[in-house]
């Protein structure tokens, strides 16, 4: 959340029904050929026009960059000066209550700092968003609509909010364990039990969100944080900048094109009204990555990537799939089904035998595998763009750049070409 022009923003939802923030201080299954007709002859069409924890003990080293610890380059100002610079941007009400410790992330219109409550010495994170910019305001409003309503162990918690005419300061719990993405890259192997433990926590959070009428719409390993660096850490869902929040009884269908290409559901690609089942598709992709270190759908060419997704075309060839249990594959298959009506719900996924048994029927051995070049490339680009050497984070404010987002224009062109082929 927070990159200035990197996201297609969601439509604003209706009024929310619950506010659990402590305080707000205002300014004084089926065959995967549902879209077979859509992707016919797509090969004849040219490519579509294209258009922060930072390092932790689990974050992979940046390729080609020597590990010199956290020593700042000579040109970098002293840490105290940097902290003072950002402290000056904070409303006096905030600094009277919280001691600004370090900048831990930034985006085009947001900054995230690690702070300490002056009275209790409890650490928190504060996200400062520049709401004078339209996109910053819209993303902020979207995230607040969700965070003011939720209280769940596996969802990032909002503590309080301070508002001025040009900025919003969101005080949030601090997660220090890094992203799931980083552990996937650095760890190199997971047992099936490891994977089911992660998925149980994420599914429980998603089930809770869906029961409230909230659809995340951008679930991926980068948006799943470990609460602390230990192996027994819980997982926290974060980054609700693209989320849709609706009251019970409202129309549950959404139309906004948004998300990250490799995790986007087929029905979004064809610009059909969709439901919260898009989150379940993304969880299928995440499960596949956890077990194999590769993505089920990946291609540098967006047209070919979208074609794979529309067909639900993925395979279990090569390592480590011969060592993966049939129950694990069945779990993935029931999520990566092109027909959203046949996809498992979060509750059904939690009750799947593989998850319930914590993969008891699997061999419990590490699934040794090489990480795909796609994931390594993404990790490398993120290393180069990381702005902080701290290992603490709350809610992401950067990481996803323009090239990693689904673009409305791309899908308009994709649909136009389909219509021309279909009508011709």
Swiss-Prot record:
A lipid is attached at residue 2 (N-myristoyl glycine). InterPro entries: Kinase-like_dom_sf, Prot_kinase_dom, Protein_kinase_ATP_BS, Ser/Thr_kinase_AS. It is found in: Golgi apparatus; Cytoplasm, Cytoskeleton, Microtubule organizing center, Centrosome; Nucleus speckle; Endoplasmic reticulum membrane. One of its GO terms (cellular component) is plasma membrane. Activity depends on Ca(2+) concentration. The active site is at residue 218. Its EC number is 2.7.11.1. Residues 98-355 form the Protein kinase domain. It catalyses: L-seryl-[protein] + ATP = O-phospho-L-seryl-[protein] + ADP + H(+); L-threonyl-[protein] + ATP = O-phospho-L-threonyl-[protein] + ADP + H(+). Autophosphorylated on serine residues. Gene3D superfamilies: Transferase(Phosphotransferase) domain 1. Residues 381-398 have a biased composition (Low complexity). Residues 59-79, 378-408 are annotated as: Disordered. This is Serine/threonine-protein kinase H1. It comes from Mus musculus (Mouse).
């Amino acid at each position: 959340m927070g990159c200035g022009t990197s996201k297609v923003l969601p439509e604003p939802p209706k009024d929310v029904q619950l506010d659990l923030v402590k305080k707000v201080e205002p300014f004084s299954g089926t065959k995967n050929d549902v879209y077979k007709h859509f992707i016919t002859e797509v090969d004849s069409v040219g490519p579509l026009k294209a258009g922060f924890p930072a390092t932790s003990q689990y974050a992979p080293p940046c390729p080609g960059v020597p590990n010199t610890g956290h020593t700042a380059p000579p040109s970098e100002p002293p840490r105290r000066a940097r902290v003072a610079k950002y402290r000056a941007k904070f409303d006096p009400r905030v600094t009277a209550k919280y001691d600004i410790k370090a900048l831990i992330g930034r985006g085009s219109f947001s900054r995230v700092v690690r702070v300490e409550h002056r009275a209790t010495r409890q650490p928190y994170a504060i996200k400062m968003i520049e709401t004078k910019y339209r996109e910053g305001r819209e993303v902020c409003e979207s995230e607040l609509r969700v965070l003011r309503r939720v209280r769940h162990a596996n969802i990032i918690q909002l503590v309080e909010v301070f508002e001025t005419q040009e900025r919003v300061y969101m005080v949030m719990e601090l997660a220090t364990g890094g992203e799931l993405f980083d552990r996937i890259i650095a760890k190199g192997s997971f047992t099936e039990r490891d994977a089911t433990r992660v998925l149980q926590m994420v599914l429980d959070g998603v089930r809770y969100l869906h029961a409230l009428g909230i659809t995340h719409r951008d679930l991926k390993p980068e948006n799943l944080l470990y609460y602390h660096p230990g192996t027994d850490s819980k997982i926290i869902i974060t980054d609700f900048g693209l989320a849709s929040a609706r009251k019970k009884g409202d129309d549950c269908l959404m139309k906004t094109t948004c998300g990250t290409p490799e995790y986007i559901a087929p029905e979004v690609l064809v610009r059909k009204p969709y439901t919260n089942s898009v989150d379940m598709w993304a969880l299928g992709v995440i499960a596949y990555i956890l077990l194999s270190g590769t993505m089920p759908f990946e291609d540098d060419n967006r047209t070919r990537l979208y074609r794979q997704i529309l067909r639900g075309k993925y395979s279990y060839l090569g390592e480590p799939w011969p060592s993966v249990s049939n129950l694990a594959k069945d779990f993935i298959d029931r999520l990566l089904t092109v027909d959203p009506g046949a996809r498992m719900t979060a509750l059904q996924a939690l009750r799947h035998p593989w998850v319930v048994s914590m993969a008891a029927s699997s061999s419990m051995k590490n699934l040794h595998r090489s990480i795909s070049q796609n994931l390594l490339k993404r990790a490398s680009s993120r290393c180069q763009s990381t702005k902080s050497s701290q290992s603490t984070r709350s809610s992401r404010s950067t990481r996803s750049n323009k090239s990693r987002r689904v673009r409305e224009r791309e899908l308009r062109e994709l649909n136009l070409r389909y219509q021309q082929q279909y009508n011709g």
